Amino acid sequence: MEKPFIIAGPCVIESAELLDVVAAELKRISEQFDVPVWFKASFDKANRTSIHSFRGPGLERGLQMLADVKTKYGLPLLTDVHESFQAEAAGEVVDVLQIPAFLCRQTDLLVAAAHTGKTVNIKKAQFLSGDDMRYPVEKCREAGCREVWLTERGNIYGYNNLVVDFRNIPLMHRWVDRVVMDCTHAVQRPGGAGGKTGGDREFVPQMALAAKVFGANGFFFETHPDPEKALSDGPNMLYLKDLESLVKKLL
């Protein structure tokens, strides 16, 4: 049976110093437990609730900062692309291109990501079922992508809330070999904190353990040394100090 893998890092690139702190801990966890870890961070958060919210350093500077992490720590990289023109440049740096949930039906974006030859991780939209994800997968494969992952991150449940139907994990296994559980975005309260997203990080461990039972291969955690001071998604991010104990439970 394949060992679980971890995707983790801060929501957005805030500074080189933050990337160093998080990457060093992820490298330590990866080596200590012999678990594959992908370092994740976004160079641009293009879908923030408010126009005044921090978005990140942008494509060119952000990719250079991610490349520095890979050189220094040897961790494979994952980042998200929001527009088709970003895919080629990002694909030259990272190992996995991620398609945001809200954009998972955007054909041109999926095709552009597929054309890079890199693995594509498609996050399931908050308004789709696991069964619906056959079609984004088909778009990537028709465009030549050799490896596609799918990620569960919950579904819209009324206003400012999400609920996870864990049946989506085995459903998505019909279309791909690797299904990931996004344990931190699944506990979001979208737009529920007055112009920004809230969240309930105390439920992150339960999300991870339930997803393990349902057959998830990978586990996605946004993590930060001090989530209360994070510039994006703080309320749902896992404290970096708590990541090791949770990873141990998943192995």
Which functions belong to the PLM regions below?
Residues M1-I7, Q64, L251:
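N-terminal amphipathic alpha-helix/helix-capping segment at the start of soluble metabolic enzymes
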Residues C11-A24, K123-R134, R153-L171, R189-A208:
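Active-site glycine- and acidic-residue-rich loops that bind
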